[in-house]
Amino acid sequence: GFAGLVTARHLVKAGVVEKLCDVTVIDAAAAHVYTPWLYEAATGALRGETGATKSKMIKMASFTYATLPGFKGVRFVQKRIEGVDLVAKQVVVEGKRLIPYDVLVVSLGAEPNYFGVPGLPENALVLKRLDDAQKIHDAIVRLLDKASARQPKYILIAGAGPNGVEFVSELANTIRILERRERIQSGIIKITLADPNPELFTILAPSLRKRAVRRLEKLGVELRPGLRVAEVGQGYVKAFTGTGKHNDAVRLPADLCIWSAGVKVNTLATSLSVLKDDRGRIVLENSYMVASHPGVFAAGDCASLINPHTGKPDPQSAQVAHYQTHDLSKNIIRYIKGQPLKAAHLPKRWAFFSALGGACAAGTLGGVKFWGYPAFLLRRISDLYYFLYLLPLVPALKTWLEGVRLYHKNDC
């Protein structure tokens, strides 16, 4: 996860790796995925770009551990974790191999939550991993090839959270550009954004919320707030509108359904014998240490740390995860040295920016609202902010600039 990898990077920068401690990062995948770029990867290269450009757009959103700069002395183990023995202080990976630890950082992240909806796992795609972006991209290409005025194709995105909004906005913008350039007929791709909440974009300030609605409508997206998915089949979605006993069933065409309506804590994290909150997240002390388990820390989507300014845990996001690593890494060093741990420093409010297709975005920073191109620039700068956490200066700048250059093709 974001938190685990960036914590390892902080320990390298602190000069303690191979001196004060040995650091091992365990992941089933061979690469770290930068999920805020996945929507770009999934919607990129739909305009006739070469196969090499398409491949680069998708791979740009990941970093192979074996070639990751700035992690000297860190050992990467590509194995699936099967369990954690908190008593024996061992991580069990595939093949029943045991990896002992003195300090453990649990950063297992989250996984899609299908809420028991029939047909959803089998008939919908999600956007969490690199291969998900590839599958969605290929599915869109197939629809573009088959769509016609007589047989339009329907794409339904279920879930108007940040990921769903950024994806649907970029997709709709791309479709409009293809129409303007007469690469496809106008109106042959129909895009719907559905969400169970009666109002969309509630994470934005009310004034920005209204502008975001107008922006998506201008891009041709049909907005369906208050729509709860009840079943997903091949070519359709059944849903309910309204609440309580007055639900009305509707059946919507969906040649492609993208599920972005919620995540849950990683299954392995929920299996740990530790205190959890009502959403299954690991309850932490204010030092990021797991309650009643000295030497075990957690961060990111699987962790529940109360923000003293709000009285509740912070949202599950990449931004929160890598921010937490500042104090987490320092407390790991303090723990190893036998020093008292310090409480986490958390902001009163989080900066938030959501891309809305092309060079347009919306968000807030320090209570100030931003819209349009200024917000889009700040959204791009937030990517650089993360890369500066993860990588040395020159590789961070090169990665960011290459991503900006490459994904700019999506915006014009």
Regions found by a protein language model. Name each.
Residues 1-75, 165-203, 258:
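Beta1-alpha1 glycine-rich phosphate/pyrophosphate-binding loop at the start
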Residues 8, 173-176, 319-347:
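Internal hydrophobic alpha-helix adjacent to the cofactor/substrate pocket in enzyme cavities
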Residues 20-22, 72-83, 173-286, 292, ...:
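A Rossmann-like FAD-binding core segment of flavoenzymes
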Residues 74-154, 243-247, 258:
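FAD-binding core/adjacent interface of flavoenzyme oxidoreductases
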Residues 122-148, 251-323:
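FAD-site-proximal beta/loop scaffold in flavoenzymes
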Residues 136-187:
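Rossmann-like NAD(P)H-binding beta-loop-alpha module
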Residues 146-148, 192, 309-314, 331-370:
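Active-site-proximal substrate-binding core of FAD-dependent oxidoreductases
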Residues 358-412:
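C-terminal auxiliary extensions adjacent to catalytic cores
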